[in-house]
A protein has these predicted regions:
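N-terminal Rossmann NAD(P)H-binding glycine-rich loop of SDR-like oxidoreductase domains
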Residues: 4-24
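Alpha-helical substrate-binding/gating segment
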Residues: 164-174, 181-216
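Conserved Rossmann-fold NAD(P)-dependent oxidoreductase catalytic core, especially the SDR/UDP-sugar
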Residues: 78-127, 137, 143
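Substrate-binding strand-loop-helix patch
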Residues: 154, 182-189, 208-228, 270, ...
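Mid/C-terminal beta-alpha module of Rossmann-like enzyme folds, strongest
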Residues: 197-248, 253-254, 287, 293-304
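Conserved C-terminal active-site "lid" loop/helix of NAD(P)H-dependent oxidoreductases
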Residues: 188, 242-268, 274, 281, ...
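Conserved beta-loop-beta element that borders a ligand/cofactor-binding pocket
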Residues: 132-154
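NAD(P)H-binding glycine-rich loop region in Rossmannoid oxidoreductase-like domains
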Residues: 35-84, 94, 100-101
Length: 305
């Protein structure tokens, strides 16, 4: 049985990854501060990523899946081992982001495109770039995954959860402009499947965009969320002069990733309807796990008044 280390492990992406691979033929360890419930069937290594200390001395892992945010996260992890080679002796997989691509590049963004600061994502994107570059300088055979908007069960980010809440409360939905904003999504279990293929096979490409091949409009996304929640949808369009991040979970920014390389590893992705239906089933039982924003209060005070 191979040993796997997942950094984090207590919220959305890292938690889903840890539980997914714990059900497979892996002995899964998670590295976190132990301030939240741990993923099922995993073993905890309790440490703060900024101060790992001796928690990883004497340890070695065949596979590492790293959800770190910045160069220091990767550096702290690699230097916490007796040798960096022991940190993912077979595969080191870093979950990066589509935020590494400047908004000025031609779209769809290809993996070969030059990374740089994106004015929408700011430091989040540049921190991911620096983490990628440092990792490749230390472990050149590492794999880097660049997803768009991830969704699915365990998503604690107030995206589909916001729309589900509106649907459950039979609220009119306030849609930015005409709802034509294009969004690219990727289902969390599809991310797991791509990583599983990377682990099992000798994948030649080491930087891989992931995502659904087709984007969906904000309007269709909201319609689908209301449909899986079993609620009729009434929409009011909101003037573009009102900052949409005050009342909507996405920026007024369209982008698309080229996922040609991903299709070699995962020819078929989860349909949005089925994926959101699974998200809703999780949401109904775990509403307290979602990090809510004040969208509804803002709408009621500033828009619907």
């Amino acid at each position: 049985m191979k040993k796997m280390l997942v950094t984090g492990g207590t919220v959305f992406v890292s938690k889903y990854l840890a539980e997914y691979f714990a059900k497979k033929d892996f002995e899964v360890f998670v590295l976190n501060r132990n301030t939240r419930p741990q993923p099922e069937n995993t073993r905890l290594i309790q440490a703060d990523r900024d101060n790992i200390g001796t928690a990883l001395r004497g340890q070695s892992f065949d596979i590492v899946i790293d959800t770190g945010y910045a160069e220091k996260d990767v550096r702290n992890l690699l230097t916490a081992f007796d040798s960096p080679e022991l940190c993912g002796s077979q595969k080191y997989i870093f979950i990066s982001s589509s935020a590494v691509y400047p908004e000025t590049l031609p779209q769809p963004f290809k993996e070969s495109a030059k990374t740089g600061r994106n004015k929408i994502w700011g430091d989040y994107g540049t921190n991911k770039i620096q983490a990628e570059e440092y990792l490749l300088s230390q472990k050149k055979d590492s794999y880097i995954i660049r997803p768009p908007y991830l969704y699915g069960p365990m998503n604690n980010v107030y995206r589909e959860a916001f729309v589900f809440e509106c649907a459950q409360k039979a609220r009119t939905f306030y849609m930015p402009k005409d709802g034509s904003l294009k969004l690219q999504f990727f289902y969390i279990e599809d991310l797991c499947k791509v990583i599983e293929t990377i682990i099992e096979k000798n994948v030649q490409n080491h930087i891989i965009n992931v995502g659904n091949e087709e984007c969906t409009s904000a309007l269709d996304w909201v319609k689908t969320c209301y449909e899986v929640a079993g609620s009729p949808l009434s929409i009011k369009n909101v003037d573009g002069n009102i900052g949409q991040r005050n009342y909507f979970p996405f920026y007024d920014y369209e982008y698309k990733l080229d996922v040609t390389l991903q299709k070699e590893l995962l020819p078929k992705t989860q349909g949005l309807m089925e994926g959101l239906a699974k998200s809703y089933e999780w949401y109904k039982k775990n509403q307290d796990a979602v990090s809510k924003k004040n969208f509804i209060a803002y709408i009621d005070k500033e828009i619907a008044k």
